[in-house]
Amino acid sequence: MNKIRTILVACCLLPVFCSCGEVAKRMDAKLAESKAAIGIVENTETDGVGESSLASGGKKSSATAAADGEYTDLEIPARLTSVPEQILRRTGYTVSYNSNRRVPNWVAWCLTVERLTGNSKRSDAKFHEDTDVPEPRAVDFDYVRSGYDRGHMCPAGDNKWSALAMGESFLFTNVCPQAPQLNRGDWNEMEQACRKWAKQEGALYIVCGPIFYKNSKKTIGKNRVSVPDAFFKVVLCMTGEPKAIGFIYKNGDGNRPKGDYANSVDEVERITGIDFFPALPDEIEDKVEATCNPDDWNI
């Protein structure tokens, strides 16, 4: 009887293990498709403008790292076809750069507790132009007396783990003209919230960037760096029950609770035209992107 009971239990559990294995395999396949679509090829070094340097930034090498709660490149959005896109792979993040606007389309990175610790200091780094993109490109003088801050997309505070990562976070391809009230206020508070979530929840997959409305024409500086109308941020957590949330901030004054900026990822996709987290299995992607529940994030 015990043998029969053991066999029955094993038979019941087998579909569960098979299901988990199938999800991992599909994620591996979709990750490979996503990276290939935007020109990211594993173990390829930078070879000039437009190529992708694959510094791993300390992440696992495959989606099979799910067992440790971290997937490689799960944060990378789908390829953009309606705007210029040059993919730049940095130590701590990946950029989709728009040469017409001189700012990123998006910046994506994985945030973990390990990345929040280290001796690298913001004070040791300076903003500098990115020579991996063609001229005209943003330079420091474009921001002087412009009325806008040099607003990090992937924040310096998420790159304390590496001096190289910290320095690269100050490249102007990771920067947008940002209203001082936003950069030093609600946007900064959201960056701090993401660090808190990473410590409490585990690895986060984050994408953020500028939003330009139809008639956006404002620029700053000699190089005509485009000034965004708003900014977005989407956050995915795969620890336990997968969940995601989006945020949209106007590029101006603001002093409101985080929940006031919250949106579903689907809504952020509708506004930006960007397909986020395409490597997720469809059943997971559809579920987490349709949901906006600030209570899940304690906001």
Question: Where in this protein do the model-derived segments appear?
Answer:
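Bacterial N-terminal signal peptides that target proteins for export
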Residues: M1-L8
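Domain-level detector for secreted/extracellular nuclease and nuclease-toxin modules, and
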Residues: L8, P15-I299
